[in-house]
């Protein structure tokens, strides 16, 4: 009995969302608006909602990798910007009702898969329609592999967060900052040390201190950060979006929950750490040391972040004019680890392997 099973499923989702809310958590849902599976019910009931080629066959979506189009063979492309306006209205109403349905069950946000492939016109309709019902609903755009101009476009369409590519940056090459500089200040971004498309961080690097360092760097760099369950415990088994289930829980290789709490507390205390704004790389002329200065969007706050990227060797850094850099004579050390009681204008400091320092100043103080 399909209706009975649907009722059970809805009750389960609603109960899950309620239990999460009671623990201070909000449930987000992954939605795919660009395409459907090849056996979707929509294909049976509304085949004219799909894009067709010249031979009348439904098109399959895909992506460019190294200049080659990789077709997603088990998926079918929706025609979200149909030239037939009646059809377009049908599709858009479907998506509005679809999201509303799950909001009524308790879902508080949506991670929009391949958001950059969906016509911006649809997002400009859909997001305001949903936020009229509940302004607190969060929309995150999956924007990996898309151009900076598209990120700005999606942000203007109403997305609360876009995803950045800091995960793949070695903190040296220019490509990331070149892309980031084109849209920073126009969108809030979400960083991540691992996700369902990558190897587990612990599998790649294996060390607790490295995990803490990268989490800190990404957290301080981006307005927000996301982790997959198990990152905090050093899980090593790659996530599979189809087959991973609770039986894949691992013993873990380390526990960095306290360190994550400390970094999150610092992040929630200072406004500048909750936005994407102007960043200037501070060159220490040392490949082991990564540093940057950030100025808040309102110009009132500044930070200097310095990290030792080496896992085995400590390194000394020198900053001769910190007060001038941060435009204040009252600079605080707000690092998640060891903190200096008093921060001088001239700093000589020995960074331990994987140590991250963050100095904060407020204009005029």
Predicted regions and their residues:
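Acidic/aromatic-lined carbohydrate-recognition and catalytic surfaces
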Residues: 1-73, 78, 82-83, 104, ...
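Aromatic/acidic polysaccharide-binding cleft in carbohydrate-active enzymes
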Residues: 187-254
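The substrate-binding groove and active-site-proximal loops of carbohydrate-active enzymes
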Residues: 1-10, 74-91, 108-117, 160-168, ...
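C-terminal beta-strand-rich structural cap/linker in extracellular carbohydrate-active enzymes
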Residues: 343-365
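Active-site-proximal helices and loops of the catalytic beta/alpha 8
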Residues: 17, 23-24, 97-100, 113-190, ...
């Amino acid at each position: 009995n399909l209706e009975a099973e649907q009722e059970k499923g809805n009750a389960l989702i609603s109960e899950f969302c309620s239990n999460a809310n009671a623990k201070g958590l909000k449930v987000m849902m992954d939605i795919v608006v660009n395409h459907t599976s090849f056996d979707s019910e929509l294909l049976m009931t509304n085949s004219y909602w799909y894009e067709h080629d010249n031979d009348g066959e439904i098109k399959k979506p895909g992506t460019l990798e190294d200049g080659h189009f990789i077709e997603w063979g088990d998926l079918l492309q929706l025609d979200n910007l149909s030239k037939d306006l009646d059809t377009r209205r049908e599709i858009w109403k479907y998506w509005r009702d679809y999201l509303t349905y799950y909001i009524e069950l308790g879902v508080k946000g949506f991670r929009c898969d391949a958001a950059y492939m969906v016509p911006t016109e649809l997002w400009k309709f859909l997001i305001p329609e949903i936020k009229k019902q509940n302004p607190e609903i969060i929309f995150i755009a999956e924007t990996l592999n898309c151009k900076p101009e598209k990120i700005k476009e999606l942000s203007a369409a109403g997305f609360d967060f876009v995803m950045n590519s800091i995960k793949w940056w070695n903190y040296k090459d220019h490509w990331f900052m070149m892309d980031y500089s084109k849209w920073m200040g126009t969108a809030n971004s979400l960083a991540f040390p691992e996700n369902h498309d990558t190897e587990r961080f612990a599998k790649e690097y294996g060390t607790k201190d490295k995990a803490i360092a990268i989490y800190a760097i990404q957290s301080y760099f981006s307005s927000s950060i996301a982790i997959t369950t198990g990152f905090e415990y050093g899980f090593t088994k790659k996530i599979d979006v189809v087959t991973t289930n609770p039986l894949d829980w691992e013993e873990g290789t380390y526990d960095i929950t306290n360190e994550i709490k400390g970094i999150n507390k610092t992040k929630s205390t200072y406004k500048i750490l909750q936005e994407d704004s102007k960043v200037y790389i501070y060159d220490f002329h040392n490949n082991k040391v990564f540093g940057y200065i950030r100025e808040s969007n309102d110009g009132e706050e500044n930070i200097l972040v310095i990290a030792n990227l080496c896992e085995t060797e400590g390194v000394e850094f020198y900053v001769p004019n910190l007060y001038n850099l941060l435009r204040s004579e009252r600079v605080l050390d707000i690092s998640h680890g060891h903190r200096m009681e008093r921060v001088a204008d001239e700093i000589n400091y020995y960074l331990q392997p994987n140590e991250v320092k963050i100095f904060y100043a407020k204009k005029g103080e």
